[in-house]
Amino acid sequence: MINRYFITGTDTNIGKTISVCALLQYLNKLGNKSVGCKLISSGCKKIKNKIFNEDVVNIMKYNNIKFKYKDINPFAFLEKTAPHIASKRKNIFINHILLSNKLNKFLNYDIDYLIIEGFGGWKVPINSNSMYSEWVSNEKLPIILVVGIKLGCINHALLTIESIKNSNAIILGWIANHLEKDLINKNDYFKYLKKVIKYPLIGKIPFIKNKKNFSNLHKYIFLKKVI
């Protein structure tokens, strides 16, 4: 049976992708067959009539089972906006059934861990009537919350956790991702979050200057606390 984790964040551009890459590297080091995917992406680039998302390309570097791009990122949009807007403008209707069908394709493969990167924060509409978070809850996907350490992160983290709990979703743990090198009081923010978040801290990623080099991130993950 595949162990499936869903990675959400306290906001967009908060470090979900770097966290997925770190988790994949950690799991690979333990000898697991690990795959990361991002079902929906926007802000993509078009190269030779093919659409690619930079986050997805980074994730695919650390998949030790190889898939075609369209399997890892079935819904990719050029416009950098919310899924319900981008998909409507392309006359593509995304719903829960479609997402489940795309996810279930991985069940046909010998995979130990499937890491699913979400889109933006927790509450994101995929069409005019449905939220991404509702699908995650229905699929009973254990959630790893990425908290970007910055001014306002305490409020963002606690509100997101409250919303996830109200959705009857399962929180596996959280990852602290440092977004700014010289953030004032960053250690105080982290210490407070560690005290008030009643879920295991499974990763602490320092500020990474080179956003194109996600290697050697496994050392910042301690997932063994919860698996």
Swiss-Prot record:
Record-listed substrate binding positions: 42
ATP-binding in keyword set: yes
UniProt GO MF annotations: ATP binding; dethiobiotin synthase activity; magnesium ion binding
Subcellular compartments: Cytoplasm
Gene3D superfamilies: P-loop containing nucleotide triphosphate hydrolases
Subunit comment: Homodimer.
GO cellular component, one term: cytosol
Active site (UniProt): 38
Pathway, per record: Cofactor biosynthesis; biotin biosynthesis; biotin from 7,8-diaminononanoate: step 1/2
GO-annotated biological processes: biotin biosynthetic process
Cofactors required: Mg(2+)
Organism (species): Wigglesworthia glossinidia brevipalpis
EC assignment: 6.3.3.3
Record keywords, A-Z: ATP-binding, Biotin biosynthesis, Cytoplasm, Ligase, Magnesium, Metal-binding, Nucleotide-binding
First-tier enzyme category under EC: ligase
Residues bound to Mg(2+): 17, 55, 117
Recorded family membership: Belongs to the dethiobiotin synthetase family.
PANTHER family: DETHIOBIOTIN SYNTHETASE
Entry-linked InterPro entries: DTB_synth_BioD, P-loop_NTPase
Binding site for ATP: 13-18, 55, 117-120, 177-178, 206-208, 213
Its job: Catalyzes a mechanistically unusual reaction, the ATP-dependent insertion of CO2 between the N7 and N8 nitrogen atoms of 7,8-diaminopelargonic acid (DAPA, also called 7,8-diammoniononanoate) to form a ureido ring.
Pfam families per record: AAA_26
Gene behind this protein: bioD
Protein's recorded name: ATP-dependent dethiobiotin synthetase BioD
UniProt cross-references to NCBIfam families, sorted A to Z: bioD (TIGR00347)
Reactions catalysed according to its record: (7R,8S)-7,8-diammoniononanoate + CO2 + ATP = (4R,5S)-dethiobiotin + ADP + phosphate + 3 H(+)
